[in-house]
Amino acid sequence: MGVWSATEAGGTQIDRMGRPAINTVFNHGQDKNRFNAGDPANDWRDFGASFVATLTQFGAADPEGLAHVLLPDILTYDTSSSAGFLNGRQLPDDVIDAELNLITNGGITGDCVGNDSTFLNAFPYLGNPN
């Protein structure tokens, strides 16, 4: 299963989100707006080459293979596998740390920002907001 969301203003798509920080890390300038206005079905055609180039600069072990994992930019979830990044997300998962580690082939393992909230054992599970 794969999901993504979009925001519209005046009938025009102005933002979309699949995995956290993908557009932030991989696109620059007007490409950010093109990505936000686009459909994930066209991600590889429209942005594949630039993702491969960026992953190559980051030192990824297999830039093209990893770009195929990251595109299309959707949250994936396979019910036959355990939840956790890249297959969904558990509350304690630090997806930014995981993405940095993944795209830099272990060169960057974290953003030095930790969780500062305690999760609850019952719904709504999230801790108190800051």
Where does each model-flagged region fall?
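Surface-exposed extracytoplasmic segments
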Residues: 1-130
